[in-house]
Amino acid sequence: KVAVICHGHTVNRYSDLKYADIFYRAGFSTVIFDERYFGESTGDFCTLGQNEARDVAAIIAYVRQIFGQDCVIGLHGESMGAATALLTLKYETPDFVIADCPFADSKLLFAQWLKRNLHIPIGMIWPILRRRAKRKYDYDVESVCPIAAVQGKNVPICLMHGKSDNLIPYTHSEMLHKACVNPNSELHLFENADHARSIVMARTEYERLVLAFLHNCGLYGTENKQ
């Protein structure tokens, strides 16, 4: 059993250790890594999960080479890493995904940020932002849409989000949960937790929910020890 853990924007693989510990004690091997442009990884820019999802798909393929094609592989991500984990569903079918404070749609996220902080409607900015990203970084920021990757995918997804998140509103996780089709998918909201702080605010409860989710998926506390 292997858990691949994806960190958030501006941090590196060391921020994943607090999550890796949960999986390690649950019998999982863990993979932590620096996403492109962060830490010791190369890269000139970040694509908020679009190209990073292909990197995670390559990591999954590598894990299967080492542990076998039938090994259990799950993803955990925080913030941008959570969006990356969900976007990976376009390329791979992991056994589960745990997404902590993801955004559902990049355009919606930018619209909310602009309205909240600059009081500018997104219609004035979005075409310029898309053209600039396409010209300078060769990617379409509007295509970074985790909810589109989730739709129709029969993968159990556990969504975790702080209700006091001031960067990505918890309503993004509510939207994503509604798009989930696997009956083992879950949504858990943490009172008074700001962005990516749920595990800090309520470590014991966070770990309990992760292990309960894995148990419901048949991957913890069962005879499945792959």
List the predicted regions and their residue ranges.
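Conserved alpha/beta-hydrolase
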Residues: A20-T42
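The serine-hydrolase catalytic nucleophile loop
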Residues: V4, H9-I22, E35
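Hydrolase active-site cap/lid region
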Residues: L87-Y139, A148
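Alpha/beta-hydrolase active-site loop
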Residues: C46-F67
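Conserved alpha/beta-hydrolase "acid-adjacent" motif
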Residues: N166-H172
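Catalytic histidine-centered segment of alpha/beta-hydrolase-like enzymes
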Residues: A193-E207
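Catalytic histidine neighborhood in serine/cysteine hydrolases
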Residues: H177-A196
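Short beta-strand/loop motif that positions the catalytic acidic residue
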Residues: G152-N154, L159-H161, D165
